[in-house]
Amino acid sequence: MTDVLRDLLQDSLQIVLCGTAAGTTSAAARAYYAHRQNKFWRILHETNLTPELLQPHQYRNLLQYRIGLTDLVKAGAGMDRATLPKLTAADRLRLSDSIMAFRPQFLAFTSKTAGQKFFGGKRDYGEQVELIGDTRIWILPSTSGAANGSWRPEIWHQFADKVRAAVG
């Protein structure tokens, strides 16, 4: 099956942000985090991970800020309850292999669900003890409007601080 959204990956990335799967709005727009209620683009700008507020159709511009994008489930679109049953060991391996190949400094899951599904169990927000090669792994709160009840922007700010400290 074809990927709903193509990975935005290349060498020399500082960060790879990984969602669970493309939402239906993102799949239709062929752009990551495209739903108007999604806070993804605003939090990237608010935390100064991007110096400008990008729009979803500008997602390829993230490469100039050394940020890449992918999803845990590449072959499905929709809410987690629709896409997660499609998650396979091959999806986890594909992500690990991509991280090993491109070697970003950080892999950050953009939802607790994505991180927990990758690791196969309960996890807290923040930096994880495991690494993929030398890549540090974080679990961040979901930016989806459907997850407003668990929105914690301070964790995104902590992550951005760690990214800047790693560069500094």
Predicted regions and their residues:
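C-terminal capping/extension of enzyme domains
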Residues: D3-Q14, H35-R36, I43, M79-S96, ...
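Short amphipathic alpha-helices and their capping/turn segments at secondary-structure boundaries
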Residues: V4-Q10, L53-L62, S98
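Short N-terminal binding/cap micro-motifs at the start of the first secondary-structure element
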Residues: L13, G23-A28
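Structural motif
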Residues: Q14-I15, F106
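N-terminal nucleotide-binding beta1-loop-alpha1 segment
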Residues: L17-T20
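Short glycine-/acidic-enriched loop or helix-start segments at secondary-structure transitions
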Residues: S26-A29, K117-G120, G149-S150
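Short, surface-exposed acidic-centric catalytic microdomains
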Residues: S26-L87
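Internal catalytic-core helix/loop-beta-alpha segment
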Residues: Q64-R123
